[in-house]
Amino acid sequence: MKIEGVLIPLITPFKDGKVDLASYEKLIRHYSKKGVAGFMPLATTGETPTLSDYEYQSILEKTVECNELNLPIYVGFGGNNTEKMTKDIKMLDKYNIKGILSVCPYYNRPDQRGIYEHFKRISESTSLDIVLYNIPYRTGRNIENDTIRRLSELDNIVGVKDACGDFTQTTELLLNRPDNFSILTGEDAFFYSTLMLGGDGGIMASAHLNTEKYVEVFNKSKQNDYKSALEIWKQVANMIPLLFEEPNPAPIKYCLSKTGVIASEALRLPLVPISENLKEKLNKFL
């Protein structure tokens, strides 16, 4: 079954230096009512590199516990130590999750053969579904489309979060897509364009806000009503650049705290709260 729709890469709320599980529970219940297709906790937007192993597991447990609609959960699980990942992934077996979102190995700068072998080893180490995560500006390496197509032939590699930043590359992948393989944009500003070319949806940090509008854009596109989808898209697209004007997820956390969805906009270093200038800009949209 293909993954499609709007999936939320959940933020991790903090308060007084600790993970705010009360706000996190509120967050999950909030988005469960918005028509989203699933949750992706503990990824980039979740500030995962700043979490302890205990916090990581606590957040995962809370996600599963509060997922009353039994929406698919794909947990962020990536790294650049393949051998360690093949062992650590066993820890996920005890949770009721659908799969993992796994970023291209970073810092080591593997070539395409190394990238393929890395994900092949991960796929052989788990029965969970795997969604590839291609975000070269963070990892230093691009997963080329031919590599994605090769990886799609492995049974449990079921899709890609495409944040390559190059719409020419995205277009080529969509036009020459593997069978039964989901292509989900991670470039928020490309959401409508990706749907127009037959994409399956998006995993977008900006969908924390105006969530129903994102879902409407997807639903109208599925009905081939691209004109209506575009009109709805125009209502939210202008806010997207502001949400990435300063490092993600700081602007989103500010908006969620300002509107009462979470208790605090706190982040963990090296990330810091947004500037007063950006707050003024965002307040006009809230």
Swiss-Prot record:
The active site is at Y133, K161. It is an enzyme of class 4 (lyase). It is found in: Cytoplasm. Keywords: Amino-acid biosynthesis, Cytoplasm, Diaminopimelate biosynthesis, Lyase, Lysine biosynthesis, Schiff base. NCBIfam families: dapA (TIGR00674). Catalyzes the condensation of (S)-aspartate-beta-semialdehyde [(S)-ASA] and pyruvate to 4-hydroxy-tetrahydrodipicolinate (HTPA). This is 4-hydroxy-tetrahydrodipicolinate synthase 2. The lineage of its organism: Bacteria, Bacillati, Bacillota, Clostridia, Eubacteriales.
